[in-house]
Amino acid sequence: MKQNYNIHTHTTRCHHAVGRDEQYILAAIEAGMKTIGFSEHMAYPNVEIPAERIYNSDIDEYLDTMYALKEKYKDQIEVLVGFEIEYYEDQKDYLLKMKERCDYMIIGQHFRYYDGYNYDYFNNDEDVLMYAHQIERALELGLTKYVAHPDYFMLGRREWTPACDQAAKVIVEAAKKYNAVLEINLNGLRYGKLYYNEGMSYAYPHPELFKHLTQENKVCFGYDAHHPATLLEENRIAICLDIIQRDDLVFLEDIHEIL
């Protein structure tokens, strides 16, 4: 199975990716993609998390550089300029303002609070439900129609509980209601299989979440690229589909449906 776009791509500005901006574009062209979208981790005013997000002071340069590259490569590939956001109610106005400065946003919730509390370090059932409602709220406000790694919370826990089912239903129903696509993240494989009470499994993609999807939900692959050559690793798709073990998923063929 092949997908001709990827809009989950990072740059060195998040401080945990490598490679020049143009190397990601050239890799996408070599992979036969028609669209490559950059979605750098959003910074929030008055707080910096250096290992996780772009600096506030780098945002203008990021946008200027990416829009220049969009123009430079327009005859070879479509380049989209965006951000990977996390939703916090007290940052709503800021996020709505930033949405006007870019082509698109995706939501990839990593923290409970805008200044920390990593869901991937540890999360309890209350945290999981908060995670789901943060995603739901971002979709409700129209900030995005793309949910990155909806199963990310499984990095910070070792059991799939009824609260996880409840959270999955919230996310899946919100995606359905607001016509959002759910991402099958191709980068979770890097963590390897983890020990869960139910047995060893990858944190994400996690099969339990995808059991909740219906034919009304659409999915896509997200390379979540932090290295240019990742965009050439098409074999990740087959591996992740084997993990999910569903052959009736509805794939989003045209990314412009949600932009």
Where do the PLM segments sit?
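Divalent metal-dependent hydrolysis catalytic cores, especially in the metallo-beta-lactamase
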Residues: 7-10, 24-53, 77-84, 110, ...
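Alpha-helical scaffold elements within enzyme catalytic domains, especially in hydrolases
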Residues: 27-30, 72, 137, 173-174, ...
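Extended substrate/RNA-proximal surfaces in nucleic-acid metabolism proteins
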Residues: 49-183
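Active-site environment of divalent metal-dependent phosphoester hydrolases
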Residues: 12-15, 42-47, 87-89, 112-116, ...
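Charged catalytic cores and adjacent phosphate/nucleic-acid-binding surfaces used
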Residues: 1-7, 11, 21, 154-155, ...
